[in-house]
């Protein structure tokens, strides 16, 4: 005959349920609300997606690249995700992949013709996709090769575009982290503002909203 005592929870079930509820509401909901409130107060732009506005309208985010069809604009790096934030990804193609090599060769020829430079002068960043496919930045060299084309398309002296390019160049964070870089969307907005005082209405920025 069994002499074991009957099972008793002594409130263990209620305690477990209360703990689970506290973790769910206190940490899952409460922590998120507090963190969101703090970041919104201290860094409102970053907390809301680092959005860029023109003429009172959101035209993009400084964190996400977007394409520009008009010759008056600087072009970002190519994107395997077609610049879709919901499909961020690289091509995952090996360096020896024939499709990758063919695509790079085609892009090199197209960019050289578009920007009026020698094929060997095309920077690698304009030929290759970033890991996310959404890199919003170019190096100064990647923008510099496009300067002549942008200036000619706008009918501006090259020095005018060069000054805006220089002003848009971001230095390494704290002088140590990263490399000098240029946010392509921010630079293109600066071009519009300098052009006619109506930012975001040029063909390209407006079309990519």
Curated annotation (Swiss-Prot):
Q: Which GO terms describe its molecular function?
A: ATP binding; P-type potassium transmembrane transporter activity
Q: Which InterPro entries match?
A: KdpC (IPR003820)
Q: Where in the cell is it found?
A: Cell inner membrane
Keyword terms of this UniProt record = ATP-binding, Cell inner membrane, Cell membrane, Ion transport, Membrane, Nucleotide-binding, Potassium, Potassium transport, Transmembrane, Transmembrane helix, Transport
**Biological process, per Gene Ontology:** potassium ion transmembrane transport
Q: Where are the transmembrane segments?
A: 18-38
Tell me which GO cellular component terms the UniProt record holds: plasma membrane
The principal localisation class reads membrane
What the record says about family reads:
Belongs to the KdpC family.
Self-association state and partner proteins as the record states: The system is composed of three essential subunits: KdpA, KdpB and KdpC.
The name under which this protein is listed is Potassium-transporting ATPase KdpC subunit
What gene does the UniProt entry assign to this protein? kdpC
């Amino acid at each position: 005959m069994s002499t074991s005592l009957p099972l008793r929870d002594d409130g263990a079930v209620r305690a477990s349920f209360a703990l689970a509820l506290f973790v769910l509401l206190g940490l899952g909901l409460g922590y998120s609300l507090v963190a969101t409130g703090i970041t919104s107060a201290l860094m409102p732009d970053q907390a809301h997606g680092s959005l860029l506005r023109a003429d009172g309208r959101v035209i993009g985010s400084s964190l996400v690249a977007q394409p520009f069809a008009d010759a008056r604009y600087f072009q970002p790096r190519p994107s395997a995700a077609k610049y879709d934030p919901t499909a961020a990804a690289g091509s995952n193609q090996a360096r020896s992949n024939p499709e990758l090599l063919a695509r790079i060769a085609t892009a090199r020829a197209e960019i050289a013709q578009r920007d009026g430079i020698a094929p060997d002068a095309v920077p690698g960043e304009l030929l290759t996709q970033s890991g996310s496919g959404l890199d919003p930045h170019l190096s100064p060299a990647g923008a510099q090769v496009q300067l002549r084309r942008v200036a000619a398309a706008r009918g501006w002296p090259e020095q005018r575009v060069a000054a805006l390019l220089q002003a848009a160049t971001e230095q390494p964070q704290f002088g140590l982290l990263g490399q000098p870089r240029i946010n392509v969307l921010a630079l293109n907005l600066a071009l519009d503002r300098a052009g006619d005082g109506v930012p975001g209405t040029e063909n390209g920025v407006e079309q990519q909203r």
